[in-house]
Design a protein with these regions (language model features):
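Enzyme catalytic cores with a strong preference for nitrogen-chemistry domains
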Residues: 1-330, 341-368, 408, 413
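ATP/NTP-dependent adenylation/nucleotidyl-transfer catalytic domains that generate, transfer
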Residues: 2-5, 153-155, 213-214, 225-226, ...
Length: 648
């Protein structure tokens, strides 16, 4: 048997950021060599970046990826075997490929057989799936090399591949690799984060290692690679159905290695591409791995922990990769803007804990013109500007909540009275119409002008700071258009537009009382959590609340999941709701349930144009409403009139 040290890398890559991507790859190779790794698996498409989208159609992107592999990366692979991910064009078709390099020599390429085409994935738009059991030859750097469904013998060890989605299909390549007596399977992945997905990947890794009765190496991206998708850096190594090594998730490092030493048999194969790599002999089936899973991974509130860490890391990468000098936030004193504010604070906390204040300051050096803040709280004040914009309909409750949250986390706090701006607009329009605007006649317009009147000042602050303006809409509001376009939707990124309001309220209560593992709760959130969500756009005496305008958020979110995620028609939604325990808890009769269903479908259909214009949002689950990458719906439609009439 041969003793082999395996490594899976998590890399924080960026599409078409050639220099940085290569720097990360070379760092991973250097770290692997320093740890005496024999075989290193890098993530899927790591040279070009996974999220290049239609840039994959550019011949220049394909040519540059191959050029960098041959000229800049391969020369650093002496005494180690490395799998690199890159796009390859063969006979007029583009493939998602992995290059196998052993001891400075390019040995061949494996092409992905199953393309991801669901959810936010559009791989079939750019790539062609490679047929199983087929190979061809490709000319690279003067050599004819095998390309396709290829396996390799590295120092006598038989190595094969599953590339990300390959492991998720029912007839996965691992079964065929087992029949070829493969000892090690490498899985270079770009598997985006979603709640609970870590356990699914773990099961796939365990099953893969059982199928081949050998070792399985799973590499992945980490961070916010291209803007919307978040990668958790989930890296694992399994042997014979047991996870022997697992890396940390949501790291603020650009490169993280997970390693394990395994004993693998020497097998003969007439079809595998041979290569020489010196491996030591061992008589024992030894397996030595290192698991760096943190305590929060076993938390009873894992979803809350994952949300805190995923969105914080996504904000960090979005800020630094866009070269923004921090954030600006219209802090209303409500749940949504409070969530966004504390996520920035958690971003600083998590980063400082992992890479230290000096390390964080170095990563964000473009943000500071003078001296670097000396404490994490002062760093929050440098990076986050919050502004409370009051009108005559604002309350002291929300103002106090906004100021308390800002001071608790260390953010800079400003207050602006925009009532004069709103009144000036009302006066101008009244003059044009030659009548007074009234709440009875002009309710919606009078609400919206307040939200829109806040936009210019907060945009101006963002321009002055050269910071990123954060929008605060959530998924529940996006579903029914309960938001003012060019008002509270203003921003360069909408961090929480992919999560429902009910969960956000639960998360804020958790953060008030408990907080993340290793961190502290933020008790000042009680001033937010004690409130009923309200837009504060109507006169105070009307006691406006979101749920009185719409329906209970729990009901709204349930209908949304059934109608949009599960693609149910109104009659199907009604059948489910009539038997649902949540409806029973509200003691709602059939008439009320029908009214809720009608309101949802009507508002959903009417407001697709708003969802088309939302700032980009982060993906955290399988219920996103982003029309560009997840849920497409016509801007103009019949609005389910026939189906809704049939409910009566």
């Amino acid at each position: 048997m041969k003793r082999m040290k395996l490594a899976a890398a998590a890399l924080n890559q960026t599409p078409i950021a050639w220099e940085q991507n290569c720097q990360n790859i070379l760092s991973a190779i250097a770290q692997a060599k320093a740890q005496q790794v024999d075989l290193l698996c890098l993530p899927e498409l790591c040279i070009s970046g996974y999220g290049c989208e239609d840039a994959f159609m550019s011949q220049g992107v394909l040519a540059t990826s191959l050029e960098l592999l041959v000229e800049d990366l391969i020369p650093h692979t002496q005494c180690i075997a490395v799998a690199f991910g890159l796009p390859m064009r063969i006979a007029g078709r583009t493939y998602n490929a992995a290059a196998m390099v052993v001891d400075g020599q390019l040995k061949g390429f494996v092409a992905k057989q199953n393309l991801a085409g669901d959810g936010l994935h559009y791989e079939p738009r750019w790539f062609t799936a490679w047929p199983a059991n087929e190979q061809t030859l490709v000319q690279v750097a003067g050599n004819k090399l095998p390309f396709g469904d290829v396996t390799f013998r590295i120092g006598g060890v038989h190595v094969g591949f599953e590339i990300c989605e390959d492991a998720w299909v029912e007839e996965r390549p691992a079964t065929r690799l087992a029949s070829r007596k493969v000892d090690v399977v490498l899985n270079p992945s770009a598997s985006h984060f979603a709640f609970g997905k870590h356990q699914v990947r773990r099961q796939l890794l365990v099953a893969g290692s059982q199928i081949i009765q050998g070792a399985y190496v799973y590499a992945n991206l980490v961070g916010n690679e291209a803007g919307r998708a978040i990668y958790d850096g989930d890296t694992m190594i399994g042997v014979d159905g047991v996870v022997v090594a697992s890396g940390p998730r949501f790291s603020y490092l650009d490169v993280v290695l997970t390693t394990a030493v395994v004993a693998v048999p020497v097998t003969e194969s007439l079809t595998a591409v041979p290569s020489e790599l010196e491996l030591s002999e061992t008589a024992e089936p030894v397996t030595v791995g290192a698991t760096e899973e943190c305590a929060w991974e076993t938390s009873t509130v894992l979803k809350e922990e994952e949300f805190a860490r995923a969105l914080s890391l996504a904000l960090f990468d979005y800020m630094r990769k866009s070269y923004s000098r921090g954030f600006v936030l219209s802090l209303s004193g409500g749940a949504d803007s409070a969530t966004v504010a504390v996520l920035v604070k958690l971003m600083i906390d998590f980063a400082v804990k992992e890479i230290g204040l000096s390390g964080l300051a170095h990563r964000l050096r473009h943000c500071f013109e003078g001296s670097v803040p000396e404490t994490p709280k002062k760093l929050v004040g440098e990076l986050l500007w919050c502004v409370y914009q009051t009108t005559r309909n604002s309350s002291e409750i929300t103002r106090d909540a906004a100021e308390s949250i800002a001071h608790a986390i260390g953010a800079r706090f400003y207050e602006l009275n925009v009532d004069g701006v709103v009144e000036e607009y009302k006066s101008l329009v009244s003059g044009v119409l030659q009548r007074k605007l009234t709440w009875d006649r002009d309710d919606l317009a009078l609400q919206n002008i307040q939200a829109r009147g806040r936009a210019p000042s907060v945009w101006m602050l963002a321009n002055i700071k050269r910071g990123l303006l954060l929008a605060t809409s959530n998924r529940s509001e996006a579903a029914v258009g309960y938001t003012t376009m060019d008002g509270d939707t203003c921003g360069g990124i909408s961090p929480i537009a992919g999560i429902d309001k009910a969960f956000l309220r639960e998360w804020l209560h958790w953060l008030e009382i408990t907080g993340p593992e290793g961190g502290e709760p933020i008790s000042e959130l009680r001033k937010v959590n004690a409130q009923q969500p309200t837009a504060e756009l109507r006169p105070p005496e009307e006691n406006q609340t979101d749920e009185s305008d719409l329906m209970p958020y729990e009901i709204l979110d349930l209908i949304e999941r059934l109608a949009i995620r599960d693609k149910m028609m109104p009659s199907e939604v009604l059948r489910v709701l009539q038997q649902h325990e949540l409806i029973a808890s509200y003691k709602a009769d059939r008439r009320q349930v029908i009214d809720w269903i009608k309101r949802f479908f009507q508002l959903w259909s009417r407001n697709q144009w708003k969802r088309e214009r939302f700032a980009p949002s982060f993906h955290v689950d399988d219920e996103n409403l982003d029309p560009k990458t997840w849920c497409r719906f016509p801007i103009l439609s019949g609005g389910f009139r026939r189906e809704l009439d049939a409910l009566e």
